[in-house]
UniProtKB/Swiss-Prot annotation:
Domain Helicase C-terminal residues, every copy: 337-484
Record protein name field: ATP-dependent RNA helicase dbp8
Gene: dbp8
Sequence motif: Q motif, positions: 95-123
InterPro entries: DEAD/DEAH_box_helicase_dom (IPR011545), DEAD_box_RNA_helicase (IPR050079), Helicase_ATP-bd (IPR014001), Helicase_C-like (IPR001650), P-loop_NTPase (IPR027417), RNA-helicase_DEAD-box_CS (IPR000629), RNA_helicase_DEAD_Q_motif (IPR014014)
Function recorded in the entry: ATP-binding RNA helicase involved in 40S ribosomal subunit biogenesis and is required for the normal formation of 18S rRNAs through pre-rRNA processing at A0, A1 and A2 sites. Required for vegetative growth.
Biased composition, class Polar residues, residue ranges: 1-29
Native source species: Emericella nidulans (strain FGSC A4 / ATCC 38163 / CBS 112.46 / NRRL 194 / M139)
Length: 525
């Protein structure tokens, strides 16, 4: 996105004529943003000023046709006021949200967020959802699935706002938080009241929010099922009137086996209105057999047929074309040393990176080890309290930490544009998990690299991954860098070994990553 024009640069473009009025010569710095007000849905005057109240470019005089074209192009790239953003969105070409019958206030809101053109999944799903059809949408990571279901929900809610209009279920707390924040941002021009219901926070405060009849509930299935079972009828009565239900990352929500969320999902869906009384939307990056089976379900009487679309879900399209997939062969005993060297090379030393492990134990140990070796690192895994998970993720988003060590709780849905490197410290057991992990980089057309540390026992796993993604991994190369030689050079192995032993001692002594003794609460008898 091009930088915003400054008031000084704008003033230089203004053509000064001898008969200019006093109003036209007024300093642009003295202009004030319009007051917030709410009018009809179709009126462009109902939009408030953006946080940086620079003047509208519409006051600039036309010098020539070429100058006007340049100014118009800059205006399209740099929306200043929400009213201007609305005009940009409505005057765009056919490949726009306007062409999808999206409400003007939503077009303006999306434009202020620099979302001007719909992606393939958005073009396919938004019109059909607005028609009232149930939907199954499959598209690779980073393709804009959240907006594909958020925009229709907000538009249909605005037509008849009442109680709890929609419930969005998602498998992880971090993804739920991200969806919650995105809905708040898109619905900023309206009086939308979303609520976040996830584990790790006080149930009593959540029960009060649920009883307050919010408009949209974003939840993890386990915590919402807890409220349905224990919080009382009055608290969850509003869920009985829900009109739209979304299962985001549906493949994970519906997968059977150990650790399955399916029982909690069934508890939630059985309490909500039946399929004939609600609109159900499923979105996923990997269409599993469980999700595909829903296509052949009998049509609900009185409802239009289910709309099913698969965009970029074939093997060759499961990872972005701008992603470079590489591997490094490592001995089992020196895996930590290779990771340390990889993160410290000339091309990677400044990159924002996510390092994935298979277990929380590995993530905890690796964070301590990398911190001891001088890396700015934080972690994200299920053993951490929710408040710490939120703060660690916020630190990583703000670049206060350069490296995030995480389990697969961070592999789904999280959109952190600054991430340009993903490292699989341990090869995932499921090829679909690899797809979700590497999808944290190279998002929305950006470039990125995924490096997998491969041991002698991981060959079959790598072959399965290559078959899943439809491409071969190439050996990691960096000009002037020999990872193996750097690992063997000097006392690096001793330093890494000492850091690992120190980290293991901290864990055994019950200390946190900063070396502080954890205070365990004693049970009251």
């Amino acid at each position: 996105m091009a930088p915003l024009s400054t008031p000084e640069s704008i003033s230089r473009e203004i053509s000064v004529s001898s008969d200019a009025s006093a109003d036209e010569s007024t300093s642009l710095d003295q202009m004030r943003a319009p007051k917030r007000r709410r009018l009809s849905e179709s009126s462009t005057d109902s939009y408030t000023a953006a946080p940086a109240p620079l003047p509208s470019l519409s006051r600039i005089k036309k010098k020539s046709s070429s100058t006007n074209a340049t100014s118009s192009r800059k205006d399209d790239e740099n929306p200043v006021l929400i009213k201007d953003a609305l005009e940009i969105g409505l005057n765009a070409e056919e490949n726009s949200f306007k062409a999808l019958n999206v409400a003007p206030w939503l077009v303006g809101s999306l434009t202020t967020m620099a979302v001007r053109k719909p992606t393939a999944i958005q073009r396919a799903c938004i019109p059909e959802i607005l028609k009232g059809r149930d939907c199954i949408g499959g598209s690779r990571t980073g393709s804009g699935k959240t907006i594909a279901f958020s925009v229709p929900i907000l538009q249909k809610w605005a037509e008849d706002p009442f109680g709890i209009f929609a419930v969005i279920l998602t498998p992880t707390r971090e993804l739920a938080l991200q969806i919650f924040e995105q809905i708040k941002a898109i619905s900023a021009p309206q009086s939308m009241k979303p609520v976040l219901i996830t584990g790790g926070t006080d149930m009593r405060s959540q029960a009060i929010e649920l009883a307050g009849r919010p408009h949209v509930v974003v939840a993890t299935p386990g915590r919402l099922a807890d409220h349905i079972n224990t919080s009382g009828t009055d608290t969850v009565a509003g869920l009985k009137r829900v009109r739209m239900v979304v299962l985001d990352e549906a493949d994970r929500l519906l997968s059977p086996g150990p650790g399955s969320m399916l029982p909690d999902v069934e508890t939630c869906l059985s309490f909500l209105p039946g399929p004939s009384q609600r609109q159900t939307l499923l979105f996923t990056a990997t269409l599993t057999p469980e999700v595909r089976a829903l296509k052949s379900m009998p049509q609900t009487p009185g409802k239009p047929p289910i709309f099913v679309t698969e965009i970029s879900t074939e093997a060759k399209d499961t990872v972005p074309p701008t992603l470079r997939t590489t591997y490094v062969q490592v001995p089992l005993t020196h895996r930590e040393a290779f990771l340390h060297v990889l993160l410290s090379t000339e091309s990677n030393i400044t990159k924002s990176a996510i390092v994935f492990t298979n277990t929380t134990k590995s993530a905890d140990l690796l964070e301590r080890l990398l911190r001891s070796l001088g890396h700015r690192v934080t972690s994200l895994h299920s053993l951490l309290p929710q408040s710490e998970r939120n703060s660690n993720l916020a630190r990583f988003r703000a670049s206060a930490a350069r490296v995030l060590v995480a389990t697969d709780v961070a592999s789904r849905g999280l959109d952190i544009p600054s991430v340009s490197l993903v490292v699989n410290f341990e090869v995932p057991r499921n090829p679909d998990d690899y797809v979700h992990r590497v999808g944290r980089t190279a998002r929305a057309g950006r470039t990125g690299e995924a490096v997998t540390l491969v041991g002698q026992r991981d060959v079959q796993l790598v072959l399965a991954i290559e078959e899943r993604i439809g491409r071969k991994m190439v050996e990691y190369e960096e000009e002037g860098v020999n990872l193996e030689a750097r690992v063997a050079k000097g006392s690096l192995l001793k330093e890494v070994g000492a850091a690992k032993r120190e980290a293991m001692v901290e864990i055994d002594e019950g200390r946190d990553v900063l070396g502080r003794k954890r205070n365990k609460l004693k049970k009251v008898r």
